[in-house]
From Swiss-Prot:
One of its GO terms (molecular function) is metal ion binding. Substrate binds at G75, D76, Q77, L78, R97. It comes from Photobacterium profundum (strain SS9). This is Putative 4-hydroxy-4-methyl-2-oxoglutarate aldolase. It comes from the Bacteria.
């Protein structure tokens, strides 16, 4: 299957929310889904390391970086750590770096763009909070479905076997 979202929209139209945000695909995994873990941070990715160091089996990290282009919230080292710990994907309302390497990893990565600079490390940010991105509410525990068509969110896990 190359396109998941159109089929989900056709079958679960009343159960999904579209995230109207144009993101670039940088990871090696083009279709990914899982339970959402949220992080709100601004130009500081130290909490990203804390989160991807934990078991991420069946989970997707959604980072609201306030659309800043001043420092990458994800690079190759954190992405490798995420893969090692079973994360399905990382979505960034902000930037990533080392995208040549990210493209080789078994991890979904979507971001606004790239920035070659690293962020500062102040241990600031808010984990597992409700966020608003592109006029869309994103809740910890939501389920996120992503492919090259974009991102859908749902309050519950969707049965993909019906597609």
């Amino acid at each position: 299957m190359n396109d998941l979202l159109p089929d989900l929209c056709d079958h679960y139209e009343q159960d999904v929310r579209w995230l109207p945000l144009v993101l670039n695909d940088y990871g090696g995994k083009k279709i990914f889904y899982g339970e959402v873990v949220t992080l709100r941070c601004f130009e500081d990715n130290s909490l990203v390391r804390d989160i991807v160091s934990q078991d991420g089996t069946g989970k997707v990290l959604f980072i609201d970086g306030h659309a800043s282009y001043n420092g990458a919230l994800l690079g190759d080292q954190l992405a490798l750590l995420a893969v090692k710990n079973g994360w399905q994907g990382i979505v960034i309302n902000g930037t990533a770096r080392d995208v040549g390497t990210l493209a080789t990893l078994d991890l979904g990565v979507k971001a606004l763009g790239t920035c070659p600079y690293k962020t500062v490390k102040r241990q600031t940010g808010d984990m597992n909070v409700t966020m608003t991105v592109a006029h869309t509410m994103i809740y910890p525990g939501d389920y996120l479905y992503a492919d090259l068509n974009g991102i859908l969110l749902s309050k519950q896990s969707l049965d993909l076997s019906v597609l």
